[in-house]
From Swiss-Prot:
The keyword Iron does not apply. The chain crosses the membrane at residues 129-149. GO terms for cellular component: mitochondrial outer membrane; peroxisomal membrane. It is found in: Mitochondrion outer membrane. This is Mitochondrial fission 1 protein. Residues 150-154 are mitochondrial intermembrane. The C-terminus is required for mitochondrial localization, while the N-terminus is necessary for mitochondrial fission. GO terms for molecular function: lipid binding; molecular adaptor activity.
């Protein structure tokens, strides 16, 4: 298997599982009870992260974080999906942190580099929106202050 085939395309992440598919993963997870296998936990977390529901995505990130801690052999995959899950939740700083850890493991991985760029682009966009909002608030405040001061002069 080539390195670039190891992780899915980023476009695939945006296509959620059907309710039926997620239900199958959920049932497998619940049926294993107290002894849920690493693969089942990973699969369920993966399905949850692909969900459109924020609660599902949050649970997916929590499960993956535990798999990451418990199973060193799955860390690379976990980091990738932790980055994606955090990105989808709007937690861009965490997403970048996970992606950076992944790139430390495999600095030449094109999918991880692409994911890192997507995260950086989103952070830059969010930063520009924040600057625009602050600028707008300052402009409105200055206009109000100017109006108040001009009223006092009359």
């Amino acid at each position: 298997m080539k390195k670039e085939d190891y992780l899915p395309n980023l476009v695939d992440i945006e296509s959620p599982l059907s309710d039926e598919e997620l239900y199958v993963l959920s049932q497998q997870y619940n049926n294993e009870g107290d002894f849920v296998s690493v693969q089942t936990r990973f699969n369920y977390a993966w399905g949850l992260i692909k969900s459109r529901k924020v609660e599902d995505q949050q649970l997916g990130v929590q499960i993956l974080a535990q798999v990451y801690k418990d199973t060193p052999s799955r860390r690379r995959e976990c980091l990738y999906y932790l980055a994606i899950g955090s990105y989808k939740l709007g937690e861009y700083t965490d997403a970048r942190k996970y992606c950076d850890l992944l790139l430390q493991i495999e600095p030449d991985d094109p999918q991880s580099a692409k994911l890192r760029q997507i995260i950086e682009d989103k952070l830059a966009k969010e930063g520009m929106i924040g600057i625009a909002i602050v600028g707008g608030v300052i402009a409105v405040g200055a206009a109000v202050l100017g109006a108040v001061l001009s009223q006092k002069k009359r």
